[in-house]
UniProtKB/Swiss-Prot annotation:
The lineage of its organism: Bacteria, Pseudomonadati, Pseudomonadota, Gammaproteobacteria, Enterobacterales. PANTHER family: UPF0213 PROTEIN YHBQ. It comes from Escherichia coli O8 (strain IAI1). SMART domains: GIYc (SM00465). It holds the Pfam family GIY-YIG. It comes from the Bacteria. The gene is yhbQ. Residues 2-77 form the GIY-YIG domain. This is UPF0213 protein YhbQ. Belongs to the UPF0213 family.
Length: 100
């Protein structure tokens, strides 16, 4: 099974784009060449700010959603220190128990 990664790309105007992929370098090159997400087209120079393995596709999708809900400040802490990423992944892996 191919591992999935969560990544953040910083645009020239200092915004952070969050995505998932199985190959961070390939996906980053797609974004650089304008063949990636429309949200990044025409945004100037792009830099890969953060990437980390997250597991399978399902977990990667949940992690992407969760990171997209973070504030800019929280995303900046994640980029700078990896702050809270292990806890975020742990919370996504913990099975939820339904109560009646």
């Amino acid at each position: 099974m191919t591992p999935w990664y969560l990544y953040l790309i910083r645009t020239a105007d200092n915004k952070l784009y969050t995505g998932i992929t199985t190959d961070v370098e390939r996906r980053y090159q797609q974004h650089q060449s304008g063949k990636g997400a429309k949200a990044l087209r025409g945004k100037g120079e792009l830099t890969l700010a953060f990437s980390a393995p997250v597991g399978d596709r399902s977990l990667a999708l949940r992690a992407e959603y969760r990171v997209k809900q973070l504030t800019k400040r929280q995303k900046e802490r994640l980029v700078a220190e990896g702050a809270g990423f292990a806890e975020l992944l742990s919370s996504l892996q913990t099975p939820k128990i339904k109560s009646d």
